[in-house]
Curated annotation (Swiss-Prot):
Function: Mediates visceral muscle contractile activity (myotropic activity).
Subcellular location: Secreted
Species whose genome carries this gene: Mantis religiosa
GO-annotated biological processes: neuropeptide signaling pathway
Designated name of the protein: Periviscerokinin-2
Miscellaneous field: According to PubMed:19808072, a longer form of this peptide exists.
Length: 11
């Protein structure tokens, strides 16, 4: 849940 990280905001 590292919201903000692209392109995987769910990582």
């Amino acid at each position: 849940g590292a919201s903000g990280l692209i392109p995987f905001p769910r990582l």
